[in-house]
């Protein structure tokens, strides 16, 4: 009897098998959209497109890259999506700033009768209603959730409250809160924030004092309410209660306390808050740093404001704007303009309309007519920023301060090209002349040479 032939050795050069676990792993570790498409191609090649888990991963990962159109293509290939997959697609569209598409998909889900709603469907849809300001549809979804038996879900109720408060329906928000059989800390905080945002401070105080448990978000919401309503003393009193309860503040708490210090006009209190933040390990980031600059400037310590600015590692546009404006307000016009040039050239930060309010204010406060006209033109021609009332007011102040009107007129004539200016500037200026019964001759010469239609 012949001996059996030995089995052939495995091919060590053959690629490893590509099954669902491998595909799932590659999707979890995918780092860009190009990789995702390659993985999807392999999924199709190996006939894995009916794997619901892989399809959901494809939708989730493509949405995380902002590729909702690709996610929709994947979703549309499914014959009978599960409720989970419908929910995922609705959520993906909503979080990627396409709420109307999310709502259309929800309507399609309703009329298709292929899938049943669950308790996660309605919160996602309500968030899409909020993002698109569709309060009418939100009310209809509210009724549909009641009929479907999901109204008592706390997550849904919290989302619904948020919708009503943010869409200016505080009474409806309170009704939802009052009907809740059980309330989480999120429920109480949503209610508190809703009342604060709708300027119902007295009601917010009652809710805050009734809360069975308070976290840093709750305390900060109430402190914010006092600051927003210009009641800084009560903001600090509440912060002391917060310390007694041993609740550590967050960055938003600190920034609100800095604003309260500004409202009090108390440099010493502002310094105390700054020192507290430093001792408790708060990082001097753009948010906190800008608030400190604003506080120090408005409380009269430009030197401290500049110190904070100089030690900041990262600076946002708001940070630059705050420092430039502070310098201009305090009469340091040349330093403000120098800082603006530094922002453009070294920091590569593009200015906005607020930046030029600070720049033009600096020119106006120091009577710098030449640079004022130059920056005004540059704002329009280089950055395409249309003049707003504050810009016009600065230019009126600047030209009124000019001792040599003819010289200012010559500067106007020396502009290289015709900017598309807002006509309100010339009108406001000449109207101001008429109100003061000032002799219009020289001023009118200036605006005749630089046609007021160009403003």
Curated annotation (Swiss-Prot):
A Pfam family this chain is assigned to: PPR_2
InterPro entries: Pentatricopeptide_rpt (IPR002885), PPR_At4g14850-like_plant (IPR046960), TPR-like_helical_dom_sf (IPR011990)
Organelle transit peptide residues: 1-19
Keyword Repeat: yes
Keyword Transit peptide: yes
Keyword entries, A-Z: Chloroplast, Plastid, Repeat, Transit peptide
Gene Ontology annotations for the cellular component aspect, listed alphabetically: chloroplast
Cellular localization per UniProt: Plastid, Chloroplast
Top-level taxon of the source organism: Eukaryota
Intervals holding PPR repeats: 51-81, 82-117, 118-152, 153-187, 188-214, 215-249, 250-284, 285-315, 316-350, 352-387, 388-418
One of the GO biological process terms: RNA modification
Family: Belongs to the PPR family. PCMP-A subfamily.
Alphabetical list of PANTHER family matching this protein: PENTACOTRIPEPTIDE-REPEAT REGION OF PRORP DOMAIN-CONTAINING PROTEIN, PENTATRICOPEPTIDE REPEAT-CONTAINING PROTEIN
Protein name: Pentatricopeptide repeat-containing protein At3g26630, chloroplastic
Organism of provenance: Arabidopsis thaliana (Mouse-ear cress)
